Swiss-Prot record:
Pfam families xrefs: GIDA, GIDA_C_1st, SAM_GIDA_C
UniProt: FAD binding residues: 13-18, 125, 180, 370
Gene it is expressed from: mnmG
Keywords of this entry: Cytoplasm, FAD, Flavoprotein, NAD, tRNA processing
Protein name (record): tRNA uridine 5-carboxymethylaminomethyl modification enzyme MnmG
Protein family per UniProt: Belongs to the MnmG family.
Keyword Ribosomal protein found: no
Superkingdom of origin: Bacteria
GO cellular component: cytosol
NCBIfam families in the record: mnmG_gidA
Biological process (GO), any one: tRNA methylation
Role of this protein: NAD-binding protein involved in the addition of a carboxymethylaminomethyl (cmnm) group at the wobble position (U34) of certain tRNAs, forming tRNA-cmnm(5)s(2)U34.
Amino acid sequence: MFYQDPFDVIIIGGGHAGTEAAMAAARMGQQTLLLTHNIDTLGQMSCNPAIGGIGKGHLVKEVDALGGLMAKAIDQAGIQFRILNASKGPAVRATRAQADRVLYRQAVRTALENQPNLMIFQQAVEDLIVENDSVVGAVTQMGLKFRAKAVVLTVGTFLDGKIHIGLDNYSGGRAGDPPSIPLSRRLRELPLRVSRLKTGTPPRIDARTIDFSVLAQQHGDNPMPVFSFMGNASQHPQQVPCYITHTNEKTHDVIRNNLDRSPMYAGVIEGIGPRYCPSIEDKVMRFADRNQHQIFLEPEGLTSNEIYPNGISTSLPFDVQMQIVRSMQGMENAKIVRPGYAIEYDFFDPRDLKPTLESKFIHGLFFAGQINGTTGYEEAAAQGLLAGLNAARLSADKEGWAPARSQAYLGVLVDDLCTLGTKEPYRMFTSRAEYRLMLREDNADLRLTEMGRELGLVDDERWARFNEKLENIERERQRLKSTWVTPSAESADEVNAHLTTPLSREASGEDLLRRPEMTYAQLTSLAAFAPALEDEQAAEQVEIQVKYEGYIARQQDEIEKQLRNENTLLPATLDYRQVSGLSNEVIAKLNDHKPASIGQASRISGVTPAAISILLVWLKKQGMLRRSA
């Protein structure tokens, strides 16, 4: 039977991608249905209890700048906040927060249940309704059918999921949850390329059985960082430390002696695992010269005794896991409360997607999260938001939107996936972006909030705060430009005390702030340039914009030059055999990838600069040289 009301957008799956997709579509005014196999696990942190990190924190800030949920949720649930790379430049500084799993899940569920235009329904989905190469709905486990103009698949590791502990394995979406086998079979019937990937998680330890007195503590930062541009530190719950231990030669011997019982090394697991979050057995074998690996003991929450040992993800048998854990300092008497495991699951080639994350083959069907070959909550959330907003736009008969590589890490993520694809779980790093100085955590709102407002994602409260911040930045920069001090002025001695070389000529506040030894806080502590802005976010922007002005201007010039060709569109139906002068290899790759633009084509392995020049000349001759806005 059909449900009585049709929807504009259906989201299948309630993880980090699904919740952002549902919130985005509903915020844009579309009637949205979120289908999940269990309402109690909405926003569940299936692996590590943390949000953010290098590259990942940038994505969270971008999701927040577009009105998303993740940053707000972690501000309410974070039990330790730190800025990574704090001593380095602003481009690579990144926020990371340890999370209380229960508080995080509660924050997500509360937001979803109070979002207008959003209905949540508990039922596993087993089928899609596809008519004339367009998706028009979904069918649940009990045969209930829902109609919609667009469907977003955010199913995580559930598609034909298989859990491995030692040489034993069983079907599962994650520990304690069933897999989605009928939906996996249905998707394999569609004209989509599918492969298998693998990820894993470490055993969880009972904190009461760890001797923390012999371990180094790691505390959060003070003052505490905040994730959301709308947040403040007063929202954070109680803060707690993490602890550090290490593997040792005894640990490594245990692992080496039991490799024949590892499903990965015994050839039982076919899927490829994450390069940048390898299992402990993988680390020991790949880095054989290392006699120890650092392990972070992270609390799972304020009301839980479980500890997450970050760094020993494993699928070795339980008895071996016990030996590994007890070989480390402070863990000699530790007890495991949940065994570690590996999980294999289906993923679909993201090169079959448009930059909007809509399928090239099934109209109205969108993919986001681990189903696209990524790993990580943050990567999933960013894709979920993009897929959700584009599903909403499609259901309203509007053109899709995707950020450029020069505009956001989300743009880098989507372009990498849709252009290059991936053979292993993809995670974000700042090194993946060409224009890191422009794509900082601190300016995510300046880059994206205006677009978020145009798209209908940003509410009035966030918009007012954003404009207030812009005004504060502009007003303060004008004040510093127009406030001067001369070498003979009474205030010169106070200024010179902060400078490595004294004033030799008249200088404005901005001139002084450009000096590497002068900070905004120091400058505005001087009588001549007081007071400082109360708006800390605006003050940070003033300092960065002034100090890095020349570098930023140079990078902006590079972006503008690159964009002239980057945005040149390539016809979706073009058969590249028509373009004379291209090699057979280039023709095959272009016909296989079907890039949407010259920029995408240029990033395909094997497509040379000479081939790009030939394409541009051919497009001009054919009168097909068009650029996207």
